[in-house]
Amino acid sequence: MIGNRRQVEYPVAVVGRGDTLTAQLLRRLTGCSVEELTPCQAAMGGAAHYRAVVVENFETHDPRTLSPCAAARWALSARTDVTVAAVDDEEGRRFAASSPAVFSYSDGLPQADLAAEHVRLKDNTLVFDALTRDDLIRVRVALGDRPRLYDHLAALAGALAIGMPLEQAAARLALI
């Protein structure tokens, strides 16, 4: 409580294509309220402030246009404590380089805040090493496949961006 006002816990937002696996995983990992937004909803704005915004990657391949994903990143970056963004594409790297509050994740770029290394599918389990600047831990996720790697990485990055320790987040992810 601050004075006679209750302190409001701001939610986390996931910008994607609707009912996303990333949002489901992030809810279960953190117990936070997670608001799902389409890129159009994110770009239209609003008054909400978020603890973190996780922007899923579904980039267009036309360099002449700003993708819906990029428009959402830019629109929400002023209304969040931190934007969680993949840096495996040029647009994500450009955004991360020009924004002060970015938590980056990648499938293999070790300079990201969270990187997946040694990714493999073994016995119907997605296994990868999660590398941060301070930690390295093996992550195991049942029934994984390559496209789902980004959902799990985005949720893990979102959890880390709001302060959950990597070891705790990886352990919880393994139980989902």
Where are these regions (language model features)?
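Acidic, Mg2+-coordinating active-site environments of NTP-dependent enzymes
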Residues: 2-34, 45-176
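N-terminal basic/disordered segments at the start of proteins
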Residues: 40-42
